[in-house]
């Protein structure tokens, strides 16, 4: 009787541990899929952009430094993309058509309170379909909320790579290497997943 009870307890404990391991593995896989989707989105934005800007080219009333509307910086944790402006029909807009120099919006990827956001700073060129975005707390109909890319972000890093594979200043980069770690505390433990992705710029004017 005692032996049977002990064996039953051992078997039950084994199955409980197995189920717990499966659930944790599933949660980790979910985090990994979220990380991949988020970086795929960001990498696609890199692919259609001309380059990284060292700082924002358009003023932002919600910039990191409230007294400096040009205080965004491309660095190890923030990325400023120079992305071609388009009209409502997805036609490219040009600052200088004779030299094929396209107008550029800024797409800014940054972390705030464990969330990766994308902010748009729209070019002032006539006909631009893009709209400047704002933090959700101050968003309006004319300045919609920044797009949420990823939540539960434990770390997010950006590396700026030239054609020879060397790390360079943002504006000299030929490609961008993104790395993100997501983390959630579930089942009395921290569950994490890390994903990295590299993408080359389109590199037009």
Where are these regions (language model features)?
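Aliphatic-rich helix starts adjacent to a transmembrane/signal segment
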Residues: 1-51
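Type IV pilin-like appendage domain
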Residues: 68-164
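Short linear sequence signals and composition-biased patches located at protein termini or domain-edge surfaces
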Residues: 130-133, 138-205
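A generic fold-level signal
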Residues: 34, 73-74, 173, 194
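Phosphate/oxyanion-binding loops and surfaces in catalytic or ligand/nucleic-acid-binding neighborhoods
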Residues: 17, 45, 49, 119, ...
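Short amphipathic secondary-structure patches
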Residues: 51-69, 73-75
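Aromatic-acidic/polar surface patches that form glycan- and anion
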Residues: 31, 35, 109, 171, ...
């Amino acid at each position: 009787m005692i032996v049977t009870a002990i064996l039953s307890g051992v078997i039950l404990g084994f199955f409980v541990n197995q189920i717990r391991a499966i659930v944790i593995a599933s949660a980790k896989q979910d985090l990994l899929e979220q990380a991949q989707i988020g970086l795929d989105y960001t990498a696609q934005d890199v692919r259609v952009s001309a380059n990284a800007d060292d700082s924002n080219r358009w003023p932002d009333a919600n910039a990191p430094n409230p007294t400096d509307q040009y205080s965004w910086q491309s660095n190890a944790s923030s990325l400023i993309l120079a992305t071609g402006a388009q009209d409502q029909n997805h036609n490219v807009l040009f600052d200088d058509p004779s030299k094929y120099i396209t107008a550029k919006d800024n797409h800014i990827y940054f972390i705030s309170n464990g969330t990766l956001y994308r902010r748009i700073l729209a070019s002032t060129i006539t006909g631009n379909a893009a709209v400047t975005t704002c933090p959700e707390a101050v968003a309006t109909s004319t300045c919609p909320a920044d797009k949420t890319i990823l939540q539960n972000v434990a770390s997010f890093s950006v590396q700026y790579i030239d054609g020879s594979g060397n790390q360079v200043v943002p504006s000299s980069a030929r490609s961008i290497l993104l790395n993100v770690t997501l983390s959630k505390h579930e089942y009395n433990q921290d569950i994490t997943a890390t994903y990295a992705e590299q993408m080359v710029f389109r590199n037009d004017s």
